[in-house]
Amino acid sequence: MDFKDYSWTEPVSDYKSKYPYNQVMETESGHIVEYDDTPGAERIHIAHRNGSFTEWYPDGDRVEKITKDKYTIVMKDDHLYVMGKCLITVQGDAEIYV
């Protein structure tokens, strides 16, 4: 399988923050929490100093980037509904246990 036929790219943040609508808190080690209320460009950005982040865009999109491993633990039911296309790219091994 050629990955170029199934490729996609990480969306780029359309950062249009304007004073005084952007509130940023940065900790001493570099963690960031940002609330941007710039009209038409509202977004929320939460970042760890290691580069992992979650960002919500003005149009409702959300990007989550994790620089190492990710674990999701659901103690009861889990439901996933995708109204459009679902594209999963695994560049390595994949295992599913049922």
Predicted segments, located by residue:
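Structural signature for extended repeat/solenoid scaffolds and their inter-repeat hinge/linker regions
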Residues: M1-V98
